[in-house]
Every structure is written in structure tokens, then in C-alpha cells.
Amino acid sequence: KDVSARYGEDTISGVAGWSDAIVWIPYEMYQVTGDRLVLKENYEAMEKWCEYIIHTAEKHSTLAIPEQYDRYLWNTGFHFGEWLGPGRGDHTGEPFGICRETAYYTTPFFGYATIKKMTEICQVLGKKDKAKDYGTIAAKMKTSIQEGMMRRNLMPDDLMGAYVLAFAFGLVPKDLYNAYKKKLLSLLEKSGRCIGTGFLATPFILDVLC
């Protein structure tokens, strides 16, 4: 339900990982039950959210990423990131600093994963044109993450969740696979084999390690 008219547009802000639930949960329910009704009933809301991600990704960020990639990265606005990550504390000294640090990777990664899921949802519902459109955007988002962030060595050096999500969402290029694998394992060893991910990456870490 759209409540922005009641509370005001300025007080409504969609954040990565939380708001993505409008796409993720109905799709999970469909995958478990095989019933497309849950997708049909929520399609309008799912579409609005995906269009919001795409539109917001087009905004310029302040990051040192070439425009050709930045325009497909959802990396502006406030996001909670992995604010429950026990791996390390805030290095910024700012309020919600760890949110900003971890949102650097959680937001574009979840943006891509959500648009990719929407592509699959459209395929299930027989919306071929929409599936093609979302598929094209998802591919550009993936390329932008790989070329604009990963190949430019802009991934965080000591945040475990970044590497867990990169593997979980199939974002790691083949030529970086071994390096990222070693990095993730080294972070685990450094932490005494304790999980250092926040609430967004923790659900994926066991599957990634397997």
C-alpha cells in the first residue's frame, strides 16, 4: 500500500535489503508453492520498487567511479547497510558511519539481485518484453559492479560481507574468483573463524563457504 500521500514523500525512503522484500518474499513464496497468484497480486508493487531502484541508480554519486558505470549502480541516499556486523566497528567517527561504509557494497549488490529476480518473475508471468528490459538493466548493473568497483580495487579490504554477497549473487568475475576466495578465507582466519558479516550477508555465508 502506498502511504506516501499520508506521511509525505520526504519521510519515505526505500533502503536496500529491507525494501527489496517486496520482490524477494513473493518470489520465494512462488518458488516454494509453485503458485503464481502471489506474483500476480504483488506485481504492481514489485514493479514500482524496481523502477525506483533503476531511477535512483541513475543519480550521480560522489564516488570515484566512471559515469558509464556509476549510472547503473544504486549507490545514493541513506541505507542501513550491515550495521549489525560484528567483524569490526565504525572507522569514520560519524553517526551511522558503519551504515555508510557497508552500504557502499550492499546497496548496488542488492539492487542488482532484485532486478535480476524481477527478470525471472516476468519470465514466469509471461511478460516477455518486461523480462527483456529488466534483464538488460540487470546485465548492465552486473557489468558496472565488476568494472566500476571490483576491477578498480574499490572493494572494502576488511569487511567480510562484501565478499560473501559478491559470491552469493554471482558477481565475481572468473579472473578474480581465486583472489576473492583467498580474501574471504583470510578474513575468516583473521577473525578466529568467527562470522563477521552483518544481517544482510549472514543468511548467505554458509552456502558461500560450502
Task: List PLM regions with ranges.
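Active-site core of glycosidic bond-cleaving carbohydrate-active enzymes
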Residues: K1-C210
